[in-house]
């Protein structure tokens, strides 16, 4: 009997040591399975550390993209102050992973991203400085239920504006062949928050100048269009449109973030958009809501006068 238990104990010890040698933290998996796939001229970071069992942190990242048509046939450099990955679907991102399988989840943050590529300077002609960009992403696909939950997609231009988007969609597969998602996907809920702290006051005049118009004229055109849509709408729809109109009218200095929401009575797809012009369908069919701290009652029907 003693020999039997000794054999079992030995086997368990062997398995335990083997499991310990196989176990890898998030940083080790990234450096072994993901990093070698990067087609970059250079990829470095000043320091790195694991984060829990499946995450990692990289500090002062430098990535040099080789010259190619997308970069104007010249090298481009991207720098990121801090990369934080809380979790990532490593199994779907390995080199030998199936091409038709999309990563099922990711939760990460990129803080202080800058670059010398044209993309990072795209807004400079409009008077917007080339400021660091912060990005946060948190999503998960449930393969069995075919549900995509985008908890957060946040893009922030430091000192200029922040946009936060979230949604839940039915009918989304974890297969890469998602071309039919626009037909199969049905929206359950969605939210968009625009927190402007100076971006609109630079973009609107610059865009108006491009069109040979004054900023006020361009804003009034948008408000008149909203006023036209507001005709014949019910109280709940008008309340939401008042928030949107007030935010647009305050483009020089918004009084807080504008938050838009959708929660259809039944899951909605692109084929349902033809209903949007029906009276009150925006609220009754699509569950549209809008909130803005500076909302002025009657702003939607006020049209161009809301900007004065």
Positions of the model-derived regions?
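Bacterial N-terminal signal peptides
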Residues: 9-16
């Amino acid at each position: 009997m003693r020999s039997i238990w000794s054999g079992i104990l030995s086997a368990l010890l062997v398995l335990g040591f083997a499991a310990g040698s196989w176990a890898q933290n998030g940083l080790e998996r990234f450096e072994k399975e993901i990093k070698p796939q990067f087609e970059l001229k250079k990829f470095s970071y000043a320091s790195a550390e694991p984060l829990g069992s499946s995450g990692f942190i990289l500090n002062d990242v430098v990535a040099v993209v080789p010259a190619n048509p997308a970069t104007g046939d010249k090298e481009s450099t991207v720098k990121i102050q801090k990369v934080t990955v809380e979790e990532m679907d490593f199994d779907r991102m390995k080199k030998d992973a199936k091409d038709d399988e999309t990563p099922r989840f990711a939760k990460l943050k990129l803080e202080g991203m800058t670059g010398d590529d044209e993309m990072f300077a795209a807004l400079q002609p409009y008077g917007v400085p080339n400021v660091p960009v912060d990005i946060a992403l948190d999503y998960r696909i449930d393969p069995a239920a075919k549900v995509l939950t985008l908890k957060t997609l946040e893009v922030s231009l430091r000192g200029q504006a922040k946009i936060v988007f979230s949604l839940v969609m039915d009918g989304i597969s974890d297969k890469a062949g998602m071309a039919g998602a626009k037909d199969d996907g049905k929206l359950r809920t969605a939210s968009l928050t625009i927190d402007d702290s100076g971006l609109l006051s630079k973009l609107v005049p610059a865009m108006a100048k491009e069109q040979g118009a004054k900023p006020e004229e361009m804003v009034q055109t948008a408000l008149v269009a909203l006023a036209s849509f507001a005709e014949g709408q019910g109280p709940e729809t008008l309340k939401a449109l008042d928030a949107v109109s007030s935010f647009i009218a305050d483009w020089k200095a918004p009084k807080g973030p504008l938050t838009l929401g959708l929660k259809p009575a039944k899951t909605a797809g692109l084929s349902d958009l033809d209903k949007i012009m029906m009276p009150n369908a925006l609220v009754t069919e699509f569950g549209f809501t809008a909130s803005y701290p500076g909302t002025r009652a009657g702003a939607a029907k006020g049209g161009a006068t809301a900007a004065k």
